[in-house]
Amino acid sequence: MKSEELFSQAKELMPGGVSSPVRAIKPYPFYTAHAQGAHITTVDGEDLIDCCMAYGPLLLGHAHPEIKKAIAAQLEKGWLYGTPTPYEPEFARLITGDHPGMEMARFVSSGSEATMAAIRLARGFTGKSDIIKIEGGFHGAHDAVLVKAGSGATTMGVPDSAGVLPALVAHTRQLPYNDAEALEAMLASHHDIAALIIEPVLGNIGPVLPEDHYLREIREITSAYGVLLIFDEVITGYRLGIGGAQRMFGVKPDLTTLGKIIGGGLPIGAFCGRKEIMSLVAPQGPVYQAGTFSGNPLSLAAGIATIRWLHDHPGIYPDLAEKARAIGDSIGGGAGGSFVRIGSMFKYFFRDSAPKNYTEVKECDTAAFGRFWEKMRARGIFLPPSQFETNFLSAAHTSDDLATLAGGYTACL
């Protein structure tokens, strides 16, 4: 069946015809038959260079042989037990060892579940009710973080989705990114804040990068007011390097959430932090968290294989950063927009300068992006279909792929 036919069927059986809204490409999404390396093959027989990489998890590319080997070996032994497995302490030791100050980890099944549990834990540890999130920061699809607030520093949250109770998100406040002074002002006047949760690099509207000293400043401010700092590194964890953004920028959060890359392409999440805080998680403490699929052996086997491969190939990170730089260099300064990159994350913003926060991101010309995306798609290049999603490179992108990407940007901008 062709993609259009499949989508016609799906619309009758599934809301919007998709399992996640971002996949609802107009007029209909392509359906993938298989993928290998940096390429997707659609059911219509098209070959596409993939710069979406499943929205971040596939740092090593599609169907990496080491990951396949680890999954296949575990499949022979079974794929779900409902009991602890030897993978759990092994993987927890790997992850905590890669992040300074991180002492304990709890595995869950998604990044959303990880941030939900981390927020609950922060409230349980501090005894305080409210959280702060950054405008434009994405932390999953649970109620506490589905908030769209005004630009005022003290504006209370209002729901960003039908079905979310205003009384619940009244405990979620928003602040602009790259504004440490706004954080200081809020904490000076509000004493009910349990935690600030933040993507150290805004990935779901970007990448939008932290200005000099911003992350260190918010670390100092939260510490001074007894507020926990939660780094949501579901995207940046192992994407920017071993140790993620916190190692890159030299900032130690109290709690960290991980996902995407640590599962090697299988569903996973983790929340991690200091033993003093993590010890409150059940069954050791009173903060409840549980899940049938938490720590499932397939995901952990794939995750361990991924992280061990990264340890064995440290050159991947400078190599990926160079690949992203080369794409930016191919564009030059004459296209009228702004190319932003960090590590293997990159984006061309249809705005004359790199955005510093959510307000500036919203100034981008989304119609121009739509036309650009269609042109790139016609050239066999698959970018995330939104001005507000990050592009990702992988270890599998070859020099030929990069040349095609550079040529596409040059021709389509």
UniProtKB/Swiss-Prot annotation:
Pathway: Porphyrin-containing compound metabolism; protoporphyrin-IX biosynthesis; 5-aminolevulinate from L-glutamyl-tRNA(Glu): step 2/2
Source organism of the structure: Methanoregula boonei (strain DSM 21154 / JCM 14090 / 6A8)
GO CC entries: cytoplasm
Catalytic activity: (S)-4-amino-5-oxopentanoate = 5-aminolevulinate
Gene3D superfamilies attached to this UniProt entry: Aspartate Aminotransferase, domain 1, Type I PLP-dependent aspartate aminotransferase-like (Major domain)
Name of a matching Pfam family: Aminotran_3
GO BP term (any one): protoporphyrinogen IX biosynthetic process
Annotated TM spans: none
Localisation per UniProt entry: Cytoplasm
Residues modified as N6-(pyridoxal phosphate)lysine: 260
EC number: 5.4.3.8
Protein name stated in the entry: Glutamate-1-semialdehyde 2,1-aminomutase
Family to which the UniProt record says this protein belongs: Belongs to the class-III pyridoxal-phosphate-dependent aminotransferase family. HemL subfamily.
PANTHER family given in the database record: GLUTAMATE-1-SEMIALDEHYDE 2,1-AMINOMUTASE (PTHR43713), GLUTAMATE-1-SEMIALDEHYDE 2,1-AMINOMUTASE 1, CHLOROPLASTIC-RELATED (PTHR43713:SF3)
GO molecular function: glutamate-1-semialdehyde 2,1-aminomutase activity; pyridoxal phosphate binding; transaminase activity
Family annotation (InterPro entries): 4pyrrol_synth_GluAld_NH2Trfase (IPR004639), Aminotrans_3 (IPR005814), Aminotrans_3_PPA_site (IPR049704), PyrdxlP-dep_Trfase (IPR015424), PyrdxlP-dep_Trfase_major (IPR015421), PyrdxlP-dep_Trfase_small (IPR015422)
Cofactor(s) listed in the protein's UniProt record: pyridoxal 5'-phosphate
Organism domain of life: Archaea
Keywords per UniProt: Cytoplasm, Isomerase, Porphyrin biosynthesis, Pyridoxal phosphate
